[in-house]
Amino acid sequence: LLGGKHVIVEKPAAMIPEHIYELQALADKSNLMYTVMHQNRLNPAVVALKRAVDENRFGKITLATVRLRWCRLQEYYEDGWHGTWLMDGGVINQQAIHHIDALQWICGPVRSVVSANSNALNKLEAEDTSISLLNFEDNFLGIIEATTAARPRDFEASISVLGEGGFVEVGGRALNKIVNWEFVESTDQDRLEVKKSSEEV
């Protein structure tokens, strides 16, 4: 930014919130962009879910969720930087951030958040388990359930949207598969959408 260039960084944007505000202010002052790469927004399954929301296929949305149940053994946190507040953060900042970004991109701004965090199994500075209740600006609720204390392996990483008009769940290894796609008013395109929007990674 000081060199007059736009900046794209890998997550996280910064480890301390004040640093994000400083970087954004510098970018704004210089008429430059400072942003974080969240590549899951480009996945066909995520794009299909976003399009369904934008086309009002759900009608009134009633619930939106992120579920991440991954396994990180204690050795993962013993390298000196994983799980530290200064260099890494916990499950929210390190693992679930891409899913949370996709959910907010799909469903819009969040008005308020209430969270509870813990170290369920692992010993680290930050959290290995987090539950959050979201209140979206469009007056529906959301839930973030994220943990690296799943055993013995990674089980799930998904985003789902539920509304009066249907239910869609995107999962897979990298938010790359449509797991559920069902609407009250289905179209001929729905089956094709599921097939073309799910890809192997």
Tell where the protein language model's regions lie, with residue ranges.
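Structural detector of well-ordered beta-strand residues that form the stable sheet scaffold
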Residues: 8, 33-35, 65, 114, ...
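Beta-strand-loop-alpha-helix segment that lines the small-molecule cofactor/substrate pocket
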Residues: 1-41, 56
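Short acidic, glycine-rich loop/turn motifs
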Residues: 134-138, 180-188
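Structured helix-beta-strand junction loops
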Residues: 3, 29-30, 87, 109, ...
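C-terminal helical cap and adjacent loop that interface with cofactors, partners, or active-site loops
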Residues: 190-201
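Contiguous beta-strand/loop segments that form the cofactor/metal-binding neighborhood of enzyme cores
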Residues: 100-176
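Short aromatic-enriched loop/helix-cap "lid" or pocket-rim segments at secondary-structure transitions
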Residues: 21, 48, 74-80, 125-127, ...
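Predominantly a Rossmann-like dinucleotide-binding segment in NAD(P)-dependent oxidoreductases
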Residues: 40-123
